[in-house]
């Protein structure tokens, strides 16, 4: 997947120098990376940054239900990292639980999880399940509204705990 992205960027950029801005503008964003950015912004207490990333995703071609699924996956991974931290387990254990061979990914998750309290992540997992089903159960809100409401409530939980 990387080679076609590099070729696309090189094909659109005039000259021989590719800037960070060129990559941001032209490269396909990976939903997992966007979800990680949103949760990282919440961990940093940068709620405006998390909301801006969500607005960017919703303005693009991302489906709200897909966004919610990826955020849910990310929050569950952060929860696993927090449990590993609380139980004194190391990176190798976290890699095994997450099913990844990337030590870097496990470390990044552990670093972000350390910024959250266990109650905030526990509530985050519960909220993910609640908001993934909310539009279908009640019909009172749209998928996009559910994702926005989830992000607000998760940020409030993180701030409170």
Regions found by a protein language model. Name each.
Residues 15-121, 158-159:
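Small-residue-rich helix-loop
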Residues 108-140:
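C-terminal capping/gating helix-and-loop segments adjacent to ligand/active sites or protein-protein/ligand interfaces
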Residues 88-90, 141-146:
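Long amphipathic alpha-helical segments
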Residues 2, 68, 121, 144-147:
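Hydrophobic packing residues in well-ordered alpha-helices of helical domains and bundles
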Residues 68, 72-75, 125, 129, ...:
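Generic structural concept
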Residues 1-37, 133-138, 142, 153-161:
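Non-catalytic interfacial helical region
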């Amino acid at each position: 997947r990387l080679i076609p992205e590099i070729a696309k960027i090189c094909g659109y950029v005039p000259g021989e120098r590719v800037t960070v801005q060129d990559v941001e503008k032209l490269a396909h964003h990976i939903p997992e990376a966007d979800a990680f950015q949103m949760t990282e912004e919440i961990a940093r207490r940068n709620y405006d940054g998390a909301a801006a990333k969500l607005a960017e995703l919703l303005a693009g071609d991302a489906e709200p239900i897909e966004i919610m699924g990826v955020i849910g996956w990310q929050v569950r991974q952060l929860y696993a990292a927090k449990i590993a931290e609380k139980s004194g387990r190391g990176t190798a254990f976290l890699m095994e639980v997450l099913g990844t061979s990337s030590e870097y990914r496990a470390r990044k998750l552990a670093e972000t999880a350390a910024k959250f309290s266990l109650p905030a992540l526990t509530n985050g997992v519960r909220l993910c399940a609640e908001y993934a089903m909310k539009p279908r159960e009640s019909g009172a809100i749209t998928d996009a509204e559910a994702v926005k409401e989830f992000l607000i409530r998760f940020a409030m939980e993180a701030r409170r705990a």
